[in-house]
A protein has these predicted regions:
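Pyridoxal 5′-phosphate
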Residues: 1-340
Length: 340
């Protein structure tokens, strides 16, 4: 990105040579993403992130029936709530893999149902890119959402796949960028950073590393949590057909998730209690409430996220600290334990 700021500083829409150089860099990233998801480059536009991409699709269907799942990101749930109506065709918006529990939704079945009725299907693929192979044509999607920071790129950059012929209404108007589909000056350094991350995915076939090394680490931690910590349970179904290989969400009876997070953070172990977009909200995770229906389970849950940079030593470090932390919290908890 530093190189891009120095070499591709010009407005990419300009006709002069520096502008052409900047646009070439943008198109390079577009082609990389298209190749990784089996799309045509002209079907992809760049945005400021997944939330903008999600809102763009849903606003296209303002006043129409919009059907989503309770597991969706807030940018889908809240936009759909504000903009849905009763007009047809219907938009179905279902993520492929949930960001809090990692589990897959039956996207192909939903797409088939949508298209049989002349409706449209959008999917937030943000969490899945780079973790598993993706093919928007095989998934039969009309729209798909991506975000650079989920693959090691910069924050503030995303992309939206729009199938040829699918309805589209720009969220931002006032410029001819992206063939009049998003009017604003290009964030060339950010898009270049996204491109560098995508090239890394392609060159290293990261989905293969996630399917082997990362899955092994995740499953080992899951096994040890259940074996060594009384009152623990998993909110993530394990298995290649069930969930992403890098996410593990677990609950610990009579231990508050935020307290677990703070104790682990003091030990240099970074976990989360839900979506980062909802951090600071004392309400239980809407995802875990939808899955379990139990506020105590939701409040006592934490999410572990693995990457190829992790090792079995990291699993050992977690298990050297976590049982003692849970035991300490359970002893001072006012919540009665169901298991002893």
């Amino acid at each position: 990105m530093r190189e891009a700021e120095q070499k591709f500083f010009a407005n990419a829409s300009a006709l002069h040579t520096p502008g052409h150089l900047a646009m070439n860099k943008i198109e390079e990233t577009r082609e990389l993403l298209a190749e990784l998801i089996n799309a045509d480059p002209e079907e992809i536009i760049f945005t400021s992130g997944a939330s903008e991409s999600n809102n763009t699709v849903i606003r296209t269907f303002e006043g129409h029936e919009i059907i989503t799942s309770p597991l969706e990101h807030h940018s889908v749930i809240e936009a759909a709530k504000a903009l849905k109506g009763k007009k047809k065709p219907t938009l179905y918006s279902y993520m492929f893999a949930n960001n809090e529990i990692g589990e897959f939704l039956p996207l192909k079945d939903i797409a088939k149902k949508a298209h049989e009725n002349g409706d449209f299907i959008h999917s937030d693929l943000t969490q899945a890119l780079g973790k598993i192979p993706l093919d928007v044509k095989a998934l039969d999607l009309d729209y798909a959402t991506f975000s650079a920071h989920k693959v090691g790129g910069p924050v503030g950059v995303g992309a939206l796949y729009i199938r040829k012929g699918a309805p589209f209404k720009p969220l931002i108007i006032g410029g001819n960028q992206e063939k009049h589909r998003r009017g604003t000056t290009y964030n060339t350094p950010g898009i270049a950073g996204f491109g560098a991350a995508l090239k890394y995915l392609k060159d290293h076939k990261t989905w293969e590393i996630y399917d082997t090394k990362v899955r092994e680490l995740r499953d080992e931690l899951a096994k040890r949590i259940l074996a060594e910590i009384p009152g623990s349970s998993l909110n993530t179904e394990l298995g290649r057909e069930k969930s992403l290989p890098n996410i593990l969400n677990a609950s610990f009876e009579a231990a508050e998730g935020e307290s677990i997070q703070l104790y682990l953070d003091a030990e240099g172990i970074v976990v989360s209690t839900g979506s980062a977009c909802a951090s600071g909200d004392i309400k239980p995770s809407h995802v875990l409430m939808a899955k379990t229906g139990d506020a105590e389970v939701a409040h006592s849950s934490i999410r572990f996220s693995f990457s190829p940079d992790n090792s079995m030593e990291d699993v050992e470090k977690v298990m050297a600290k976590l049982p003692g932390i849970i035991d300490r919290l359970q002893k001072i908890s006012t919540i009665e334990r169901k298991t002893k």
